[in-house]
């Protein structure tokens, strides 16, 4: 088996609301920077091309999955897998909060956010259609990645289903703002608990990409990080726009999953029967 390591990166940036051309230019610059560092996988935050609080202006930000602007980003670094956040239009008036996997100069896959939060200061269920399928993409031989977008990771069943497919990586693009759920719910502390728990539980490296900066009254606190398969922090962003990177190793993943075989011992048939009884 080819057990060559995978150099990965996470971009922490502050997208400008509805400024697609400016955001595309910023993405291109970060992709070139990552390419110069010989990274093979690069993750941007949720809705990185559009900004977050789109509301009734969501249609202005939308593009189809085969949009030439996405393809132009893919062509910058054809030997790198790049994951960017965008609003996908699938039919007139129907939109998804989505990410595109850019690979070999093409759009290799699109994942659509399933769990749309509509509580606190979050209103995604008003503007987007929920996705219905999980997606797994091969970044290079023996390295596959699954993506769950932000609130997807607050539905444990979605994480479990994604991990039953045994990806080597879990990608977590988010748009997390301070106190947007409530004053008592600390996004900063709770996201740290969330991603480190899943990394440790499933023996999976987690790449978390959050924004940093203001959008209207919202403050996106950053905290982007790369976690190893035991929940350890391999790289963490400072309080600014930046690129962080780490090198991941298949042997470390195998050792973590051998020590704690959560996926091997999942007993999916029993869980399915119990779900059918509930």
Regions found by a protein language model. Name each.
Residues 1-41:
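N-terminal glycine-/serine-/threonine-rich phosphate-binding loop
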């Amino acid at each position: 088996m080819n057990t060559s390591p995978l150099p990965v990166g996470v971009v922490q940036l502050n997208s400008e609301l509805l400024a697609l051309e400016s955001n595309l230019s910023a993405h291109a610059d970060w992709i070139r920077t990552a390419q110069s560092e010989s990274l093979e996988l690069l993750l941007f935050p949720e809705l990185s091309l559009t900004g977050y609080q789109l509301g009734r202006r969501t249609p202005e930000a939308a593009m189809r999955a085969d949009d030439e602007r996405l393809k132009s980003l893919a062509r910058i670094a054809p030997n790198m897998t790049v994951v960017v956040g965008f609003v996908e239009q699938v039919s007139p008036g129907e939109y998804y909060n989505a990410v595109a996997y850019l690979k070999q100069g093409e759009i290799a896959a699109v994942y659509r956010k399933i769990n749309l939060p509509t509580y606190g200061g979050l209103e995604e269920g008003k503007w987007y259609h929920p996705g219905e399928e999980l997606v797994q993409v091969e970044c290079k031989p023996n390295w596959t990645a699954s993506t769950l977008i932000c609130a997807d990771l607050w539905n444990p069943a979605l994480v479990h289903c994604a991990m039953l497919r045994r990806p080597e990586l879990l990608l977590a693009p988010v748009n997390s703002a301070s106190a947007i759920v409530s004053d008592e719910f600390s996004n900063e502390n709770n996201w740290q608990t969330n991603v480190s728990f899943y990394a440790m539980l499933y023996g999976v490296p987690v790449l978390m990409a959050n924004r940093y900066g203001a959008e209207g009254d919202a403050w996106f606190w950053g905290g982007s990080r790369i976690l190893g398969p035991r929940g350890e922090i391999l790289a963490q962003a400072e309080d600014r726009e930046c690129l962080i990177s780490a090198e991941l190793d298949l042997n470390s993943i195998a050792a973590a999953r051998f020590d704690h075989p959560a996926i091997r011992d999942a007993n999916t048939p029993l869980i399915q029967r119990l779900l059918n009884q509930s």
